[in-house]
Amino acid sequence: PEPVVLPRERSDEESAKVLSSVLPVILEYNDYEQTYSDNWWEKLKHGTAAYGVFWNSAKENGLGDVDIREIDLLKLFWEPGVTDIQKSRNLFIVDLVDEDLLEQQYPEHKGHLSGGAVDVKQYIYDDTIDTSNKSVVVDWYYKTTSASGKTLLHYAKFVGETLLFASENDPNYRDTGWYDHGLYPVVLDVMFPEKGTPVGFGYVAICKDPQLYIDKLSSNILENSMMTTKKRFFVSDSTGINEEEFLDWSKPLVHVQGELDDRRIKEIATNPLDDIYVTVAQMKIEEMKDTAANRDVNSGSAGVTAAAAIAALQEAGNKASRDMISASYRTHVKINSMCIELIRQFYDETRSFRITGQTPGSYQFIDMNNAGIKEQEVGQTSDGLPLYRKPIFDLK
């Protein structure tokens, strides 16, 4: 999806047009389409996709730019009991980093960059993952309230008991916070929400138990089919049957010693399963389809030929998918809103962007900085204090 930025005031129309053209370029620079696709798989499978919207000062040869990336939920920690992650008192993003790389980046703390303040859970890999020379780096975001009542977002980075950076210790951020928007730089896209937690559950959690029953029933049905189609015999020890010839179906003759009767060799009778068990297995499959909203009308199965009936069935079958997509669009709006706030805060230098033209294959260049979207002084109060106007934009 591409954002459309709309102004709330007439004076901001030009800035809104520029943002509508520039935001897709910034998303493209961040390979957002791949991140969006990867996170959709996470959302479908595990119920939650986590996006991080940061300012990366190392981008653009040190000029800095917006950085949008996927966050692993195993490395994200929040206050228990909150449903909205923005209401959490603290937010932690942890990562395992090689100690030698940390010493190169922070040489003043050499010898003090080992330790694990947080136990980082890991996935079960086929390969052996060595974490002996890695340390847990914690990015800690927390909110405070200024004297004027404004919510400030502060940021600290530490390893073990060694503090690497704290925005409250930096005069540039002490009074304004790390990001001016005052929000945690994390956006969660939830599949099926739950009370008391900002994350949800996905299709794996929904379909796991029905699939276990389906697998067990199918296994038993297949086992019975194999037993029924493969003949076995009770053979008396006194029966002189050439077993090699008996087991080799390519030989027309099987030699025996003595007489053969039902007392010396007898086929083992295997009773086939009733049709009811196949019906039960099919019912469980249909149940899982209903639970997962994976109906035949969504995949174009035959059976209904009237156009109006097909449209009605598809409309009814798409309710779940429409809500999933709408939730991702709402997440997309939050991500782009954070991008606008980072542009407002950090785009002091004019930058050039190539945007798509009106005709196919055409393009043009536009220049942009944050002069038109920063807070603008519009007057003074009776006490002589300046009054500021902040341009606000809506995203569609």
Language model feature labels by segment:
Residues 1-396:
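Extended alpha-helical, oligomerization-prone segments that build pores/tubes and scaffolds
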